Amino acid sequence: MDAAAQTSLVVSEDRRHPANVICALCRLFYANNWVTGTGGGISIKHPATGHIYIAPSGVQKEQIEPEDLFVLDGVDGAYLRAPAGHRPSACTPLFLACYRARGAGAVIHTHSQHAVLCTLLFDDVFRIANIEQIKALPSGRRDAAGKPLSLSFFDTLEIPIIDNTAHEEDLAPGLEAALARHPACTAVLVRRHGIYVWGPTADRAKVYNEAIDYLLELAVHMHRLGVPPDCPIGEEKRFLRR
């Protein structure tokens, strides 16, 4: 593929094009303090071509432009575009694992402080229940017509936690094992590191990431009060620290 063809993969006036969405989300996530210091990453699969777009490693997320992005073939994972002067994302093996195992349309990786704190408070699985925001997340269940169902207010959200490794790419086996153990989960926490969140589209992945971060932050506050995040309704005062 010549230079012009490679450039055409990432240059588009369509604001919904994956290259433009990645740049916009990187700026938003930086403003939310989720991807500071070049940390974190994001990938989106083009709904029409199946090409996989990935933000590079080592680039300040709020400064990323479409020309900075890597593009992979969605079938064999071969690089269709590798911009000079940039390193492929160390998250790439994990993004690909989510695409394979979950049929995801987008994957988000942040270094949210709320995510890191919750990995210190829970062992193998983060749990929170009976909170309205849970309803923004998928349950893994479907109705009689096959339509995906969201979690209900009375459901418990469970997110598996895996241990961190010295190198990002070495997280892939642990993430794949967590996906197999928790077939309904839409996120995996990485201890002392951050979180991976995915969804069927970039819009859904964004919503899931925002909802989960809200719940993680709430869980930290509940823990400070002595209230378990999965506390049954009506028993909160029994746990409150005086």
Swiss-Prot record:
On the tree of life, the source organism's domain of life is Eukaryota
- Binding sites annotated in the UniProt record for substrate: 91
Question: What name goes with this protein?
Answer: Methylthioribulose-1-phosphate dehydratase
State where the protein is found: Cytoplasm
Q: Which parts of the sequence bind Zn(2+)?
A: 109, 111, 193
What general EC class does the enzyme of this chain belong to? lyase
Catalytic residue list: 132 (proton donor/acceptor)
Pathway the protein takes part in: Amino-acid biosynthesis; L-methionine biosynthesis via salvage pathway; L-methionine from S-methyl-5-thio-alpha-D-ribose 1-phosphate: step 2/6
* Membership in a protein family: Belongs to the aldolase class II family. MtnB subfamily.
Entry's EC annotation: 4.2.1.109
The biological processes this protein is annotated with in GO are: L-methionine salvage from methylthioadenosine
Q: Does the keyword Disulfide bond apply?
A: no
Ordered alphabetically, the record's keywords are: Amino-acid biosynthesis, Cytoplasm, Lyase, Metal-binding, Methionine biosynthesis, Zinc
Pfam families linked to this entry = Aldolase_II
Q: How is the cofactor bound?
A: Binds 1 zinc ion per subunit.
Q: Does Zinc count among this protein's keywords? A: yes
Provide one Gene Ontology cellular component.
cytoplasm
Show the catalytic activity: 5-(methylsulfanyl)-D-ribulose 1-phosphate = 5-methylsulfanyl-2,3-dioxopentyl phosphate + H2O
Query: NCBIfam families per the record?
Result: salvage_mtnB
Q: Name one GO molecular function term.
A: methylthioribulose 1-phosphate dehydratase activity
| SUPFAM superfamilies listed in its UniProt record | AraD/HMP-PK domain-like (SSF53639)
Query: What job does the chain carry out?
Result: Catalyzes the dehydration of methylthioribulose-1-phosphate (MTRu-1-P) into 2,3-diketo-5-methylthiopentyl-1-phosphate (DK-MTP-1-P).
